[in-house]
């Protein structure tokens, strides 16, 4: 019998930990969006580059999903989530080095790499949910996950905009990197009982 949202959440400590790590990572992923837009407009004034940035981020996220699915089947899912977060700490901080129009394509490239890593995290997280949640609770868990994704997207972008307007882009990127660090720390104690798909391995 499917549990209600509150009962499910209160009775699944491992899911709560995974959910918290994921929401914080999602907030970080979208927190820097406004800061990146601001840098592009400040240094280039190009609406075209804004479109390129958004397109690159979305295309790389979408096109990488089949490969990410294979990785989630063949590799440790907790490890994929942890290390994708760790890698994004340095990448987020690297945006602080942007200081002119000549850095715009580098900015777009780094942002695209972050979305690739975000895709790795999201796919591994979704694949990990059945490892820590009873089958009858998967619908509830997936509903919470979908709602959290949409909420984190909007909230992360909004908070990023507030920080940029009050404290500047450097502060936004520092806070952004801290969200990935915090998400990684939350993941450390999490135990995910995963059976590696041996059929996916090569000879």
Describe the residue ranges of each PLM region.
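Alpha-helical transmembrane-bundle signature of multi-pass membrane transport and export proteins
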Residues: 1-203
């Amino acid at each position: 019998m499917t549990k209600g949202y509150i009962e499910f959440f209160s009775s699944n400590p491992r899911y709560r930990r995974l959910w918290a790590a994921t929401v914080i990572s999602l907030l970080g992923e979208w927190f820097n969006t406004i800061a990146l837009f601001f840098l592009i407009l400040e240094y280039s004034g190009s609406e075209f580059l804004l479109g390129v940035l958004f397109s690159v981020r979305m295309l790389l996220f979408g096109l990488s999903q089949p490969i990410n699915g294979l990785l989630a089947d063949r590799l440790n899912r907790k490890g994929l989530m942890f290390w994708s977060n760790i890698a994004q700490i340095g990448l987020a901080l690297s945006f602080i080095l942007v200081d002119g129009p000549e850095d715009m394509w580098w900015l777009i490239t780094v942002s695209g790499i972050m979305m690739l890593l975000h895709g790795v995290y999201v796919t591994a997280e979704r694949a990990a949910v059945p490892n820590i949640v009873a089958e009858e609770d998967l619908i509830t868990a997936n509903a919470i996950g979908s709602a959290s994704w949409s909420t984190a997207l909007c909230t992360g972008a909004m908070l990023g905009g507030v920080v940029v307007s009050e404290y500047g882009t450097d502060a936004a990127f520092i806070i952004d990197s801290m969200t990935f660090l915090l998400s990684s720390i939350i993941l450390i104690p999490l135990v995910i009982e995963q059976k590696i798909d041996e059929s996916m391995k090569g000879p």
